[in-house]
């Protein structure tokens, strides 16, 4: 008499073919071995469900804000698939930064134009003459102020007192100048603003300065890693990742 054969617990045998010599098939999941030799766990794979659609065109930005999906296609912005405005600048890639204030807004920009949209879907162009004419990708909201960055390594800030990304203070300016390389991307890590340049990265924090920019450089924080391309910068679960120079 032969010894009894131990069958796997995680799946039933012969559920793919009639032969018991062929392993079972896991659909939309995967198995991993646990701490013990005979421990196995089955995990469901992440899945996607249809939510909304937008017209065909060049995708320029996508962002989830307050459980609503905002997408920019060509020169139009959609909220959960519904058109909010067709008057955007139809160029480049848009980046986003949620803002607070009396009326919370979503600030979004490409390299030449900036806009806000509120929860009601009202889109407003930033027309303040103090907003820089050209910027690099990325925008950051920190302690009531919205910041943008340009290729000359200037960090511009909105009116800190008003908590309004449509109003920009001409004195709210600081330069990432430890090294003389061009600005590539502005990002945020925890409570710090990262000025990513071609070959170096510099960090700033909100020092609450009464005059000029509220920001001050974090002493000793210079990193000898720049950014190859702004589109490689991603925040993954609080960890900032990018392709470095």
Residue ranges with predicted function:
Residues 67, 104, 192, 238-240:
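Short active-site oxyanion
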Residues 55-63, 89-104, 130-143, 180-186, ...:
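Repeated scaffold domains used in trafficking and secretory/extracellular systems
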Residues 72, 106, 242-243:
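Short beta-strand/helix segments in adaptor/scaffold domains that form protein-protein interfaces
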Residues 1-84, 136-204, 208-209:
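N-terminal beta-propeller domains
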Residues 82-113, 118-127:
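Acidic, glycine/polar-enriched metal-coordinating patches/loops
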């Amino acid at each position: 008499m032969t010894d009894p054969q131990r069958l796997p617990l995680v799946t039933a045998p012969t559920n793919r073919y009639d032969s018991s010599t062929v392993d079972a098939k896991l659909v939309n999941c995967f198995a991993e071995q646990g701490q013990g030799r005979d421990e196995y766990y089955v995990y469901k794979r992440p899945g996607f469900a249809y939510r909304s659609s937008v017209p065909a065109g060049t995708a320029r930005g996508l962002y989830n804000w307050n459980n609503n999906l905002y997408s920019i296609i060509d020169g139009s912005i959609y909220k959960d698939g519904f058109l909010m405005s067709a008057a955007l600048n139809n160029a480049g890639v848009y980046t986003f930064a949620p803002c607070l204030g009396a009326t919370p807004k979503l600030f979004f920009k490409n390299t030449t134009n900036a806009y806000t949209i509120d929860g009601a879907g009202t889109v407003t162009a930033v027309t303040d003459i103090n907003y820089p004419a050209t910027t690099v990708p990325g925008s950051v909201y920190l302690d009531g102020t919205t910041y943008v960055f340009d290729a000359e390594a200037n960090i511009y800030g909105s009116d800190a007192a008003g908590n309004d990304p449509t109003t920009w203070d001409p004195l709210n300016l600081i330069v990432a100048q430890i090294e003389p390389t061009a600005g590539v991307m502005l990002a945020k890590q925890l409570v710090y603003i990262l000025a990513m340049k071609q070959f170096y990265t510099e960090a700033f924090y909100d020092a609450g300065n009464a005059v000029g920019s509220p920001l001050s450089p974090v002493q000793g924080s210079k990193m000898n890693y720049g950014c190859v391309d702004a589109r490689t910068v991603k925040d993954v679960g609080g960890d900032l990742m990018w392709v470095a120079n």
